[in-house]
């Protein structure tokens, strides 16, 4: 029997801007995933339906591979693994990172659930998850 890999330890919190608007933030405890944090904060925040659709198409086998290009970051979605990287070739922005595609898909769905919780006014933040 294959041992199930734990998902990344992460924390969701709410960032409040001066104009009283809020944004969901996700942080991963492993610094390797800093670029992934940026991907959620900029791209998933703005383009959730498109990203979810492309990941789902690969995870369910409708497509062998796919990709998405956002405002700052891109993802190359493979059957087993997805690369998250900055569009600009500038190492000061952050290094690319790789994550199992199915895990990224689950994290994107979870992020949407957390965003819905935030908008409902749920008093659960900050919340740390590791499953």
State each model region's role.
Residues 1, 113-119:
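Secondary-structure boundary elements
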């Amino acid at each position: 029997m294959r041992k199930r890999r734990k998902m990344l330890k992460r924390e969701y919190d709410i960032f409040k801007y001066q104009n009283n608007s809020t944004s969901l933030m996700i942080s991963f405890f492993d610094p390797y995933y800093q670029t992934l944090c940026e991907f959620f904060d900029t791209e998933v925040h703005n383009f959730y339906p498109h990203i979810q659709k492309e990941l789902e198409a690969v995870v369910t086998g409708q497509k062998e591979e796919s990709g998405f290009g956002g405002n700052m970051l891109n993802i190359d979605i493979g059957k087993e693994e997805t690369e998250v990287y900055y569009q600009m070739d500038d190492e000061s922005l952050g290094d690319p990172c790789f994550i199992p595609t199915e895990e990224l898909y689950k994290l994107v769905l979870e992020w949407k659930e957390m965003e819905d919780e935030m908008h409902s006014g749920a008093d659960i933040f900050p919340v740390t998850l590791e499953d």
